[in-house]
Amino acid sequence: MKTCLVFAFFLVAVFAAVQAEENDSPQTLPRRLTVRAAQSFGRCNQKQCDADCVKKGYFGGLCTLTSCFCTGSRS
């Protein structure tokens, strides 16, 4: 029984070592694409921001305190 446990532990250790070697490549995430829409003075209108960005070929827009940012390219 004891040899069976030692053998099982050995197999788990070997499997873990092999998996660790295969996953040496660093994980990289693609950068989010954000494009500034036309500069608007004053407050940003969310509906207008979305509409302008969709017309330009993006998924939508996000209003910030200063301007509208288009997010996600459809192409």
UniProtKB/Swiss-Prot annotation:
GO terms for cellular component: extracellular region. It comes from the Eukaryota. Residues 21-32 form a propeptide. Residues 1-20 form the signal peptide. It is found in: Secreted. Disulfide bonds join C44-C63, C49-C68, C53-C70. The keyword rRNA processing does not apply. The keyword Membrane does not apply. Coiled coil: none annotated. Keywords: Antibiotic, Antimicrobial, Cleavage on pair of basic residues, Defensin, Disulfide bond, Immunity, Innate immunity, Secreted, Signal. One of its GO terms (biological process) is innate immune response. Belongs to the invertebrate defensin family. Has antibacterial activity. This is Defense protein 6. It comes from Lonomia obliqua (Moth). The lineage of its organism: Eukaryota, Metazoa, Ecdysozoa, Arthropoda, Hexapoda.
